[in-house]
């Protein structure tokens, strides 16, 4: 989901910044960048800061990108994702408001249950992806992408004004908390030491407000962007450094930056907004049909429904697929060809997989080439390499569900 810089590098590696989602070392832009509450904390721990989406964020720390990636898969890592836009939608008509701009069935969410959903336009394109939680405190808690902050806020604020002008009860508030992601197989074991709530009773895509290592008012959501078990903690900004410092005292926990986050999400088959999905991609083309609520499909009452719903019943022209590639690492914008050498699509994300020690990628191909096992070619530095369409995720996910 979350839009991050595409800065993964070959195994063994020299870190490279990819130009599609801009990130650059801090220089003259430093003074105009926003800083998270953990900025000084990152510097003190060797964070290599880059400019991303108007923020100064760590791309990695003293450990290599690959070390951080593998540590997350085997133990757990702490990511600062405070640049994400956090909002509350409240009022009696809050569900009706959000359902006017997203494709999901928000009304069916139980108290403190969440889901991934999509903002769409009337042409069926994806404006952004978001996580929405139906809190037991009487509001919807929404987390969306930093790179889409302005357009997401404008979309929601315009809808609030429209609904209020119609006499409906809605409101919107930006949450100025920090947001920390603790990800990996031992993440909740680490967290359990600092909370009184039983983490075994908090399954994937549910949340609760609790005190975490002495910091009150934290919303803990069992979700993440790595494919591993883990949580995202919305923490009051004044408590962010204390919480991060306390978590880091546990030997299971290491800091990780944008580079590891990108390769982890790609192994998990998760989309990067702006690369893998955008305003010209429909949920069906993006292999995200599961985000469309069944009730919403029948009612056809979400933006772009007249375009999107018919695609569910027939073949779309193109489809997002996974690719396992031979040869050199494959990057975004690399052409995809059929075995006759005709260009049929484009890679949208790619990197060497530290877990698999293979090159993995995502891209779009015509529907007839989207079946797993289909042999194709990719072009890297003007040379053609064999690739095969693969099921995703590339690495099995480990989300926690109640037995």
Swiss-Prot record:
Its main location: mitochondrion. The glycine cleavage system catalyzes the degradation of glycine. It catalyses: N(6)-[(R)-S(8)-aminomethyldihydrolipoyl]-L-lysyl-[protein] + (6S)-5,6,7,8-tetrahydrofolate = N(6)-[(R)-dihydrolipoyl]-L-lysyl-[protein] + (6R)-5,10-methylene-5,6,7,8-tetrahydrofolate + NH4(+). One of its GO terms (biological process) is glycine decarboxylation via glycine cleavage system. Residues 1-28 form a transit peptide. It holds the Pfam family GCV_T_C. Keywords: Aminotransferase, Mitochondrion, Transferase, Transit peptide. Belongs to the GcvT family. SUPFAM superfamilies: Aminomethyltransferase beta-barrel domain (SSF101790), Folate-binding domain (SSF103025). Transmembrane segments: none annotated. It is found in: Mitochondrion. GO terms for cellular component: glycine cleavage complex; mitochondrion; nucleoplasm. Coiled coil: none annotated. Signal peptide: none annotated. It is an enzyme of class 2 (transferase). GO terms for molecular function: aminomethyltransferase activity; transaminase activity. The gene is Amt. This is Aminomethyltransferase, mitochondrial. The glycine cleavage system is composed of four proteins: P, T, L and H. It comes from Mus musculus. InterPro entries: GCS_T (IPR006223), GCST_C (IPR013977), GCV_T_N (IPR006222), GcvT/YgfZ/DmdA (IPR028896), GcvT/YgfZ_C (IPR029043), TrmE/GcvT_dom1 (IPR027266). The modification N6-succinyllysine is found at residue 368.
């Amino acid at each position: 989901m979350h839009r991050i810089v595409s800065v993964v590098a070959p195994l063994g590696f020299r870190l490279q910044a990819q130009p599609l989602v801009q990130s650059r070392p801090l220089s003259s832009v430093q003074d105009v960048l926003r800083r998270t509450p953990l900025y000084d904390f990152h510097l003190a721990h060797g964070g290599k800061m880059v400019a991303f989406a108007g923020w100064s964020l760590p791309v990695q720390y003293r450990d290599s990108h690959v070390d951080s990636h593998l540590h997350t898969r085997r133990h757990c890592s702490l990511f600062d994702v405070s640049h994400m836009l956090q909002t509350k939608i409240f009022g009696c008509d809050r569900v009706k408001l959000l359902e006017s701009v997203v494709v999901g069935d928000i009304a069916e969410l139980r108290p403190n249950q969440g889901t991934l959903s999509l903002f769409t336009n009337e042409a069926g394109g994806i404006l952004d992806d978001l996580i929405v939680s139906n809190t037991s405190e009487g509001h919807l808690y929404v987390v969306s992408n930093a790179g889409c902050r302005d357009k997401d806020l404008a979309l929601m604020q315009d809808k609030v004004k429209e609904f209020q002008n119609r006499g409906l009860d809605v409101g919107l508030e930006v949450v100025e908390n920090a947001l920390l992601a603790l990800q990996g197989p031992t993440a909740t074991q680490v967290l359990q030491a600092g909370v009184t709530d039983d983490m075994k009773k908090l399954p994937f895509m549910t949340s609760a407000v609790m005190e975490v290592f002495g910091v009150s008012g934290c919303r803990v959501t069992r979700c993440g962007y790595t494919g591993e078990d883990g949580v995202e903690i919305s923490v009051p900004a004044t408590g962010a450094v204390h919480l991060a410092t306390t978590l880091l005292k546990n030997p299971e926990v290491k800091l990780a930056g944008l580079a590891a986050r990108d390769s982890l999400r790609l192994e998990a088959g998760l989309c990067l907004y702006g690369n893998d999905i955008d305003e010209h991609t429909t949920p069906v083309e993006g292999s995200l049909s599961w985000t469309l609520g069944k009730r919403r499909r029948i009612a056809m009452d979400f933006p772009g429904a007249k375009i999107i719903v018919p695609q569910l019943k027939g073949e779309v022209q193109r489809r997002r697929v996974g690719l396992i590639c031979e040869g050199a690492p494959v990057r975004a914008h690399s052409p995809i060809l059929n075995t006759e050498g005709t260009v049929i699509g484009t890679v949208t994300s790619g990197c060497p997989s530290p877990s698999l020690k293979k090159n993995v990628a995502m891209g779009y191909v015509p529907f007839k080439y989207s079946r797993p096992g289909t042999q194709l070619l990719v072009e890297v530095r003007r040379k053609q390499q064999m690739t095969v369409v693969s099921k995703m995720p590339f690495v099995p996910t480990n989300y926690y569900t109640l037995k």
